[in-house]
């Protein structure tokens, strides 16, 4: 039969073991578990940028992470995802540096001139960057309205010819001067023989009067540095 002293000693040993287990369980070598990331912020200079559609933004988007204690979060993973605009991202997964900052390698905007959005996610938290894609340099002039018309001699065609000045992706480029010139048929350009493209790239002549002789009439639209566009119309008696 165990003595009272032996039983008391066993209880003490058992109790000490439980106490040690509790102490060990309460301690952790993982700083993330006791001081998690609670804040994800954009760095101001990398948000709300503007650049030509289909090109890389000048400043790569960055976020800075903070822990619950207010300390900068080092070594945390941030995922960057394109949310709108059709662009692409290079370096979609980044790790925060000693400053708590994670930077995407490159963000290329979509080819359509429009708003673009990039989301950064870390520890279930997210922020969204916005960038605006605008038309790039003009590369071509294309006919949009008024091709292959027919009208009585010495009268105007029903639809005044129009062209669109576009960049390499087809976005309209404003502020480009278009010159209108009759090439054949002895017709007349009504209004000014020079028009500037609107913000959507559209440039339209006020009117085109065909010549006095039945047959084909040709009108040319040209902008400096690009192949000209020709419109044809048939004058009938």
Model-derived features: where do they sit?
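The feature marks long extracellular or luminal low-complexity segments
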Residues: 24-237
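Sec-dependent bacterial lipoprotein signal peptides
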Residues: 1-25
């Amino acid at each position: 039969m165990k003595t009272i002293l032996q039983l008391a000693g066993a209880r003490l040993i058992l109790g000490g073991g439980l106490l040690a287990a509790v102490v060990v369980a309460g301690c952790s070598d993982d700083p993330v578990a006791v001081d998690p990331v609670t804040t994800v912020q954009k760095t101001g200079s990398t948000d709300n940028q503007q650049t030509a559609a289909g090109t890389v933004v000048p400043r790569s988007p960055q976020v800075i992470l903070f822990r619950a204690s207010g300390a900068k979060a080092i070594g945390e993973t941030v995922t960057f995802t394109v949310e709108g605009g059709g662009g692409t991202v290079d370096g979609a997964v980044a790790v925060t540096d000693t400053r708590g900052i994670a930077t995407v390698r490159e963000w290329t905007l979509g080819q359509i001139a429009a708003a673009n959005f990039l989301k950064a996610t870390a520890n279930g938290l997210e922020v969204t960057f916005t960038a605006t894609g605008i038309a790039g340099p003009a590369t071509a002039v294309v006919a949009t309205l008024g091709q292959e018309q027919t009208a009585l001699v010495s009268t105007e065609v029903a639809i005044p010819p129009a062209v669109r000045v576009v960049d390499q992706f087809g976005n309209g480029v404003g502020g480009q001067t278009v010159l209108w010139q009759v090439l054949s048929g002895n017709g007349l350009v009504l209004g000014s023989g020079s028009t500037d493209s609107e913000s959507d790239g559209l440039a339209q002549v006020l009117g085109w009067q065909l010549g006095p002789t039945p047959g084909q009439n040709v009108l040319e639209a040209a902008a400096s540095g690009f192949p000209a566009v020709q419109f044809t119309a048939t004058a009938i008696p």
